[in-house]
């Protein structure tokens, strides 16, 4: 297989782009580095395209390795033909290779292998040839052997039938046809093990769906229901047509002696050997497809959550709500430093609302708090009521935001949190984290395992290694798109920077603590174990504010500094002119980009990036995202009525719709059919996590805590 050609066709890009990307990946370059600094080489393939290419490259190389192993194994057995070798080499999937290898794979002891040991292969061949005019009972007599354990003609014929059944099952073409037929025309069904038992799976108690139309979230729901022993799940294949197909291939002569036996063998081969295997394969295929879809959605949700704009310049009060143990508060200044921590008890069972308000007033006055970040966990509704009442009583203009506290408890009990806040308890750490994730979501959320952030579906049922790899890639891409301040970034944030390992991240922080702030990017080369390759990969993503070189505040790579300086000089500027907001309008002065790029010795795409950075250094792509909805009043679910139009924030996205926070402590669901007047294939085509949207209330069920919303306002 020509892997480069295959990738070119799959990704629908030029062959030279794939060749360049593969070469760069093989040389040890990271995806963010290739995407940002090797645009000319790859034709500006983005990070998503490069990750897809990398994953497929690994799969196809593994496939080629497997083919080589299979060919070698069959050759050692002395059974390799040119035709078989060509078929294996042409196989496009691991399943196709497995089908071709099946007859030659070393087998565990089966009914067929035991029959062969008893010397019944000859009788099986007689039946398969379909030429005999002698009754099978008579043919079988010569295969009787007390020594081999064949006592009767019935045992001999049964053994021969087992051999034929396995040979039919091992036929690659048959399996391919049956698999495709079942995928195209089969159904997946589920039944309740106990219909009287109430469960979240009631939708699937009498469920049937064509395999070809099976939605990923339904597959994952069936898998979970089956694992919890609530459902029985089956694949229903077009059996009559499949048996007819097999008989037409196996029974080639109308022989009254062998045909009835072969009909019986075909049924046995299909029901006992082929059907269970095909069912497993199809269930696995559906699960893989569902998991990939769910991981893709999870990744998109995570990216959008990480890329939410920071709220800079405000002192924030982080509020971790609780009942019995009290609400933990943390005052965090605009730099993320914790100024104070307090515990108040406005909720049951203590209900010390008056005392809590007095404490809050003092904190707001003392630290000039302008924003409260309230976690959405237990007791958040009661806490919000206290906040709203307080805001009406004080002269200061303070607003609040309800933030997801998913993962905050995981972080607060972690080794990292203990190192960061050694004198705080878990509640105080959690409150600080809740405040910081509003100030800078990216910097705070990277400290938490992406799987704990709570924007996925069925994440605990998936292949955890694959999920971790995919989500790690999303975090890496997000961190590198934004870039980090080399002098303030934490080790967990630095870990995600291109080319920086966990060890290097710790070494950078240790070096910074021992030697003071970095004044120049080149100082990175003094960090233990950070060599030229790591420097090349990471330098452009690490910013130095107020350093020796103004270009260090930009994402211009040091390898392009000479070109950037030549450009500045030719336009009558110096590097110092970048300081204080950049060179507005510089892009208009570069009138002949192709000629200018040639003169500077860089590509046009690199020149464009340099100009963009000089025009607006340290620009933050998150600034273009919708900002959180700041609130000063509260709604109750009972206040909602159909037809009411509200502003809300998209909190999570699933295959079937989006959950929107409208400020009533219960996210409402906008079903995919209610997102637009036009047909929508997937919610991600319309919305993303963090989007602020106008929604209309369709229905409210207070008892079941369900709110149905629509984005179709007309």
Where do the PLM segments sit?
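Low-complexity, acidic/Ser/Thr- and charged residue-rich accessory regions of DNA metabolism proteins
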Residues: 139-153, 207-208, 245-270, 274, ...
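A glycine-rich phosphate-binding loop feature that marks nucleotide/adenosyl-phosphate handling sites
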Residues: 179-188, 319-323, 377-379, 403-410, ...
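Long, charged amphipathic helices and adjacent flexible linkers at domain junctions
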Residues: 281-299, 452-483, 598-642
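Long, charge-rich intrinsically disordered scaffolds of nucleic-acid metabolism proteins
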Residues: 96, 401, 407, 412-482, ...
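Accessory alpha-helical DNA-binding modules that contact the DNA backbone or grooves
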Residues: 30-31, 42, 46-147, 481-624, ...
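Duplex nucleic acid-engaging cores and interfaces of nucleic-acid transaction enzymes
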Residues: 49-51, 59, 63-318, 322-412, ...
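Short beta-alpha connecting loops at secondary-structure transitions
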Residues: 18, 341-348, 371, 413-426, ...
């Amino acid at each position: 297989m020509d892997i480069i050609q295959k990738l070119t066709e799959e990704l629908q890009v030029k062959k030279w782009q794939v060749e360049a990307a593969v070469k760069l990946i093989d040389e040890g370059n990271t995806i963010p580095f290739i995407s940002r600094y090797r645009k000319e080489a790859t034709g500006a393939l983005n990070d998503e395209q490069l990750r897809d290419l990398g994953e497929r490259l690994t799969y196809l190389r593994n496939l080629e390795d497997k083919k080589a192993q299979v060919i070698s194994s069959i050759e050692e057995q002395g059974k390799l033909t040119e035709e078989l070798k060509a078929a294996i080499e042409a196989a496009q999937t691991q399943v196709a290779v497995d089908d071709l290898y099946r007859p030659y794979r070393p087998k565990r002891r089966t009914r067929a292998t035991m029959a062969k040991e008893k010397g019944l292969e000859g009788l099986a061949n007689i039946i398969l040839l379909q030429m005999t005019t002698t009754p099978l009972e008579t043919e079988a007599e010569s295969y009787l052997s007390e020594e081999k354990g064949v006592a009767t003609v019935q045992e001999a014929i049964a053994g021969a039938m087992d051999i034929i059944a396995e040979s039919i099952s091992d036929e690659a073409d048959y399996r391919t046809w049956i698999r495709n037929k079942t995928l195209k025309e089969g159904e997946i069904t589920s039944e309740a093990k106990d219909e009287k038992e109430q469960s979240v799976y009631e939708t699937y108690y009498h469920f049937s769906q064509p395999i070809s139309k099976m939605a990923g979230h339904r597959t994952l729901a069936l898998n979970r229901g089956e694992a919890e022993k609530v459902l029985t799940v089956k694949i229903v294949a077009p059996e009559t047509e499949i048996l007819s197909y097999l008989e037409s291939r196996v029974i080639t002569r109308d022989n009254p002696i062998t045909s009835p036996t072969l009909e019986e063998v075909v049924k046995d081969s299909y029901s006992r050997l082929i059907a269970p295997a095909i069912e497993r394969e199809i269930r696995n295929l559906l699960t893989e497809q569902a998991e990939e879809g769910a991981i893709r959605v999870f990744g998109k949700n995570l990216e959008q959550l990480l890329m939410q704009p920071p709220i800079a310049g405000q002192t924030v009060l982080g509020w971790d709500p609780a009942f019995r143990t009290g609400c933990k508060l943390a005052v965090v200044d605009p730099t993320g430093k914790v100024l104070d921590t307090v515990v108040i008890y406005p909720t049951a069972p203590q209900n010390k609302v008056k005392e809590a308000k007095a404490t809050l007033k003092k904190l707001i006055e003392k630290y000039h708090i302008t924003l409260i970040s309230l976690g959405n966990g237990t007791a958040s509704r009661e806490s919000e009521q206290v906040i709203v009442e307080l805001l009406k009583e004080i002269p200061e203009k303070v607003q609040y935001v309800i933030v997801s506290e998913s993962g905050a408890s995981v972080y607060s009990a972690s080794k990292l949190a203990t190192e960061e806040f050694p004198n705080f308890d878990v509640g105080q750490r959690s409150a600080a984290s809740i405040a910081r994730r509003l100030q800078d979501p990216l910097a705070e959320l990277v400290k938490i395992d992406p799987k704990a952030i709570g924007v996925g579906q069925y994440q605990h049922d998936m292949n955890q290694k694959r999920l971790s790899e995919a989500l790690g890639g999303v975090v890496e891409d997000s961190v590198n798109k934004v870039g980090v301040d080399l002098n303030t970034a934490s080790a967990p944030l630095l870990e995600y920077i291109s080319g920086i390992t966990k060890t290097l991240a710790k070494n950078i922080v240790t070096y910074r603590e021992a030697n003071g702030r970095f004044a120049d990017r080149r100082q990175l080369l003094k960090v233990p174990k950070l060599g030229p390759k790591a420097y090349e990969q990471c330098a452009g993503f690490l910013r130095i504010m107020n350093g020796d070189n103004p270009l260090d505040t930009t994402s211009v790579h040091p390898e392009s500094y000479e070109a950037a300086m030549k450009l500045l000089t030719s336009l009558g500027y110096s590097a110092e002119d970048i300081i204080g907001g950049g060179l507005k309008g510089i892009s208009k002065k570069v009138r002949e980009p192709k000629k200018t790029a040639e003169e500077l010795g860089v590509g046009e795409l690199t020149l464009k990036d340099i100009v963009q950075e000089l025009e607006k250094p340290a620009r933050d792509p998150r600034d273009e995202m919708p900002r959180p909805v700041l609130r000063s009043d509260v709604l109750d679910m009972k206040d909602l009525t159909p037809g009411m139009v509200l502003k809300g924030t998209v909190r999570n996205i699933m295959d079937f719709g989006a959950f929107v926070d409208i400020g009533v402590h219960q996210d409402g669901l906008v079903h995919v059919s209610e997102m637009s007047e036009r047909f929508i294939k997937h919610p991600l085509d319309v919305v993303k996590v963090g989007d602020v949207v106008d929604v209309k209330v369709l229905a409210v069920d207070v008892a079941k805590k369900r709110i149905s919303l629509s984005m179709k306002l007309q």
